[in-house]
UniProtKB/Swiss-Prot annotation:
This is Ribosomal RNA small subunit methyltransferase H. GO terms for molecular function: rRNA (cytosine-N4-)-methyltransferase activity. It catalyses: cytidine(1402) in 16S rRNA + S-adenosyl-L-methionine = N(4)-methylcytidine(1402) in 16S rRNA + S-adenosyl-L-homocysteine + H(+). Specifically methylates the N4 position of cytidine in position 1402 (C1402) of 16S rRNA. Its EC number is 2.1.1.199. Belongs to the methyltransferase superfamily. RsmH family. The gene is rsmH. Pfam families: Methyltransf_5 (PF01795). It is found in: Cytoplasm. It comes from Campylobacter jejuni subsp. jejuni serotype O:23/36 (strain 81-176).
Length: 310
């Protein structure tokens, strides 16, 4: 079976979860099954719940992981909603979310993620109603500016939005290739990433509501308050990593009083656990040589030791 995607930080993921014995493991973003396959092999007593919103990825992984069919349950869902759909939540001992776009999605011309694509789609869930086409051709100049500024951190966001609106007034923009030509190839000042790459990333974030989905997922976990459970999140964008870092910091605090209050009044017992990774884990030199797309990957991990379910 030809594998269309290389899982990032595979060794590091296995290291984070190496001490898991029994219970349930939730792979929130199964993709093409690389992480789950390795963990299934190394943890024979763990049962798995494997989730993905991409039907193509799910179908592929069902075939790839057929030897483990008696230990794995598949769920088609966005990972922000999966906690509401699954059983055995109280038995979760490990949770993994790899929230990047797979190589298969990037390289599949019809999905419209690549700047070379003849399509303009970018939906991770192809049942979603809004694609990149609708955003590029119907959003106002102000809305587009906000997307490029907030999600792409582009200094010339207004200029890019203006160019798009000018071109679409002549004819609808129908392909990623066409959009790429409109945006231009230039670098974003001192940054090594091209403005087109940043703009495409910003559009993809808007199409899939990626930051909202991540926040919703973390808020659901906060409400769930798992016991004896390790959570690892792999992100590929500085905004995503910032959100994860902020939530982990919040969860690790005992005191939740306003910083202006001199004396603790909250009981000083609100911590949900400990941060496992003091700094985000990045790809090794060896991995970067094999898979250049791992260069932006950052993994953070948290241990929920919420024994009293406060």
């Amino acid at each position: 079976m030809e594998i269309p995607h290389i899982p990032v930080l595979l060794n590091e993921v296995q290291e984070i979860f190496k001490n898991l014995k029994t219970g349930y493991f939730l792979d929130c973003t199964l993709g093409f099954g690389g992480h789950s396959e390795a963990l299934l092999k190394n943890h024979p007593d763990l049962k798995f719940i494997a989730c993905d919103q991409d039907q193509q990825a799910l179908e592929f992984s069902k075939k790839r992981l057929k030897d483990f069919h008696n230990r794995i349950t598949f769920v088609q869902s966005n990972f922000s909603e999966v906690l509401e759909k699954i059983s055995h939540k109280e038995e979760l001992r490990g949770i993994l979310a790899d929230i990047g776009v797979s190589s298969f999605q990037l390289d599949n011309n019809e999905r419209g993620f690549s700047v070379n694509s003849d399509f303009l789609d970018m939906r991770m869930n192809q049942n979603s109603k809004i694609s990149a086409y609708e955003i590029i051709n119907t959003y106002t100049k102000e809305q587009l500016t906000s997307i490029f500024k907030d999600y792409g951190e582009l200094h010339d966001a207004h200029f890019i939005a203006e160019k798009i609106c000018l071109e679409r007034s002549k004819n609808p923009i129908k392909s990623a290739k066409e959009l790429y030509q409109i945006i231009g190839k230039g670098k974003q000042n001192h940054r090594k990433i091209s403005k087109a790459t940043l703009a495409f990333q910003a559009i993809r974030i808007e199409v899939n509501q990626e930051l909202k989905v991540l926040k919703d997922f973390l808020e659901h976990l906060e409400n769930l308050k798992p016991k004896n459970c390790i959570l690892a999140i792999i992100s590929f964008h500085s905004l995503e990593d910032r959100i994860v870092k902020q939530f982990f910091k919040k969860w690790s605090k005992n005191c939740i009083c306003n910083e202006k209050i001199m004396r603790c009044e909250c009981g000083n017992n609100h911590s949900l656990g400990q941060i496992i990774t003091k700094k985000a884990i990045s790809a090794s030199k060896e991995e970067l040589l094999k898979n250049s797309r791992s260069s932006c990957a950052k993994m953070r991990a948290f241990y929920f030791n919420n024994l009293d379910n406060k």
